Amino acid sequence: MASVVDICNLALAHLGDNATIASIDPPEGSAQAEHCQRFYPIARDTLLEMHSWSFSTKRAYGAEVENTWSMWEYAYAMPNDASDIIAVIPPEARDDYSTTFTPETYPDFYTNYSPSVAAGQYVPQKFAVETAADGSEIILTNQKQAVIRYHAKITDPTKFSPLFTITLSWHLASMLAGPVIKGDQGAAEAKRCITLMNLYLGKAMEADSNARKIKPEHIVSWIAGR
């Protein structure tokens, strides 16, 4: 698996650089290493936000905290490593797409009843992410014993898929082109790198999506109503 330095050197190689940096934390002293130290975290984090990558998707039981808002029944602490929330689901749901909803697992079963709910099809649980009085982020929802699905802040490059790594190298190269090459040539090179980044991004997203084979479970309403 590629290291952070490997990804940085790959990005520099895309620009025709010698690509021989040995460290960016701390930077070894070269201008290239300093540029990589500045831009690598930005490139990584923005690319992580572009897709629901399977390697960054986690689920955890919500840790209930004090709820001071009457319009929501429950409040849960934001997972420490979460960057954003994907879904709030009942504890027995295998995925976001289907579960057998009952008055116990779906708080709005009666007030928002519909055939899709009775048939066991996925109905997203409403939630809001807000900041509590103490400055901590909390998740507000009506779901009891909620399971939180979220995107984690992934900094370990060994967790990245190979296509994500290649995409990240081109994304980083587009940011390095200006300070490394400079001028109009640097701007033109940045555009070339963005084009190739988008090409590999599509391939990476397709491969990542193919890794998930979730089929919504259909339960006819007369069975669900038993």
Cite the ranges covered by each PLM segment.
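Acidic-enriched, low-complexity/disordered segments with a strong bias for Aspartate over Glutamate
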Residues: 6, 17, 25, 45, ...
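Internal mixed-charge
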Residues: 7, 12, 111-226
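Short, intrinsically disordered N-terminal pre-domain segments
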Residues: 1-25, 225-226
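Alpha-helix capping and helix-loop boundary segments enriched in small/acidic/polar residues
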Residues: 2, 31-34
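Intrinsically disordered, low-complexity, basic-enriched segments
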Residues: 21-30, 37, 41, 45-49, ...
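Divalent metal-cofactor coordination and adjacent catalytic microenvironments
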Residues: 34-115, 121, 125-127, 160-176, ...
